[in-house]
């Protein structure tokens, strides 16, 4: 994610793709309330632009967030200044005792970190187990096979007031790999006048089989 989520893509992701983070925050706050941890610390892996972290802070939870994208962390620090937000791979994240560890938005499936495809996730899950307080929660989602139906690749277009994004998705069922090629368009100020730029993020891949199997 350090390459794929540069300044423009981080801006667009924050502006137009925050619904999942907001919904997840509502769910996690309720789960922690039911678990008797209404003020418990939350460690958010792949914290993105801080939408989730801000909602947890507003609900009274201390938050530590990790993200490998400097652009995402910069946005998150503006949105959630009360959170402890750290730049780096979640595979190396410090995990203090906590009520919950979260990894929302399929971040455990991304292959930007080489360790995700190897034994890195096994070690991470073991450390999460050690960090969670009794009754603590691990909340995450992963990419599932079959995302692309019909002819591959598939293209989609989405736009907002000052941005647009073109996404091309290709799935290799044999290799269990999903690849996204993303082109962003964003209106930006230039010398006091309106301007625009287009950027193509490096293709990002995720592995639907990345999360360790647990019986």
Model regions and ranges:
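SAM-dependent methyltransferase
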Residues: 139-214
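Short glycine-rich, flexible loops that bind phosphorylated cofactors or substrates
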Residues: 93, 109-111, 147
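A short glycine-rich, Lys/Arg-flanked "PGG" loop and its adjoining helix->strand segment in the class I
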Residues: 119-134
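Nucleotide donor/acceptor-binding cores
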Residues: 40
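A short SAM/SAH-binding and catalytic strip from SAM-dependent methyltransferases
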Residues: 99-119
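Class I SAM-dependent methyltransferase SAM/SAH-binding core
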Residues: 43, 49-93
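Non-membrane alpha-helical structural segments and their capping/turn regions in soluble enzymes
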Residues: 22, 70, 118-122
């Amino acid at each position: 994610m350090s390459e794929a989520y540069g300044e423009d893509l981080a801006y667009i992701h924050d502006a137009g793709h925050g619904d999942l983070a907001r919904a997840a925050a509502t769910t996690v706050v309720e789960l922690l309330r039911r678990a008797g941890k209404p003020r418990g610390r939350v460690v958010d892996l792949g914290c993105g632009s801080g939408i989730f972290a801000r909602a947890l802070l507003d609900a009274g939870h201390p938050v530590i967030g990790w993200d490998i994208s400097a652009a995402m962390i910069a946005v998150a620090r503006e949105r959630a200044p009360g959170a402890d937000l750290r730049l780096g791979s979640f595979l190396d994240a410090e995990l203090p005792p906590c009520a919950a560890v979260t990894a929302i938005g399929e971040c455990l499936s991304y292959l930007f970190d080489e360790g995700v495809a190897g034994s890195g996730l096994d070690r991470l899950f073991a450390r999460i187990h050690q960090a969670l307080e009794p009754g603590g929660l691990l909340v995450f989602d992963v990419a599932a096979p079959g995302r692309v139906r019909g002819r591959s690749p598939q293209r989609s277009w989405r736009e907002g007031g000052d941005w647009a994004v073109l996404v091309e998705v290709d799935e290799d069922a044999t290799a269990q790999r999903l690849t996204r090629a993303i082109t962003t368009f964003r209106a930006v100020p230039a010398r006091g006048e309106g301007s625009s730029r287009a950027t193509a993020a490096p293709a990002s891949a995720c592995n639907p089989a990345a999360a360790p199997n647990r019986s």
